Amino acid sequence: MNSLLRKLSWRIYHAVHTNGLAADVVYWSAFYFQNFWRRRNYRRVSQNTVSPEELWEHRHLEPSATLVTGVTNICNAKCSFCAYPKVVANKTLQTGIMPFDVFKRAVDEWAAVGGHSLDLTPVVGDPLVDPGLLEKVDYAVNQAHIKNVVLTTNAILLNRNDTYKRLIDLGIGGVFISTQGASREVYEKVYGVKHYDDAMSGIRNLLEYNRAKGEPSRVVIRFRNAEKPSQIIHSKDFADNIKPYLSEQVRINFTVDFDNWGGTIQPTDLSGFMRLRKLPPPLNVPCQNLFNFAVRHDGRVRLCGCRLTRSDLDDLVVGNIREKSLEEISKSDQAWSVIKGFYSGKRPETCLECTFYNPIDRRWLERRASVNPALPAEKQVATAIL
């Protein structure tokens, strides 16, 4: 039964994403549906919030989450929907590449606690810029035995030194590709660089090689589209380089709305079909993204590996892996102070006007508790502290 449902689901998904009219209708409607669903969820959360006392005993790093190791915060694109070009222009971003010893320490600690998912994607930047990326992928997959190692890339450097082949051969779990569409002119406007051919060739080679190897890796092409989905679906490059390789393991999607990077991105930064996500109502509840700890290239540990406004060295930084373990940092007073601050309306700068906000709720807590039950001693400490 599950197999039949999966196949049916795939056929519906494929039909929508290869039919221009269907895709236009679905993604146009999704904007309004998602806004309705978010409002409903915010109302539900506000009526039955998770208390600090309940959260405290499940606040720390736990295996069902995703650890982010941002191997570099340097990018080779200047996307109009991303904060990277602005923080570089303002010279507020300290860039670098993660040394192998920092990466190894983070991965070893993550493997020791039973972590399943590792994301090599930085808050800003492209992981393929890191010349030591493949060594890190090899270590995480084949020596630390992390089950699900993934990364997001703009595909510009996939062809360099046959990176597309080596990622598949090393056993990467997933490659998520961020690209504009199938129009050179619009690509150059949105991504700010003239690498359309490099990206499209890299995508084609990755999909072709993955298919030849039996599709061991999941590939998802995420169109950050200024064009309507139908314009991309009907384009020659989509028909020649992407559509033939679509399968249950290889999928595409279009962007319903774009977040504002904590207020850094404004409607004037977007173009064409792009729409900005609406600002959520102020809820004094922590965000789920605070619990996906992110290790910066220099070893500093940050709550939230998703967004920044001016820098990734901000008030979301709560420690350094060179000085303390991830477990210690996740249980530290500094980390708890940031999380608990949400309950009194005190938020870090990046979080003040963030449209990516996703509040914790009862279901989230139940899932977290089911895989990481609190010890009696922790409950006693929580009662004493709170």
Regions found by a protein language model. Give the residues of each.
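Processing junctions and N-termini across compartments
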Residues: 69, 73-76, 281, 312, ...
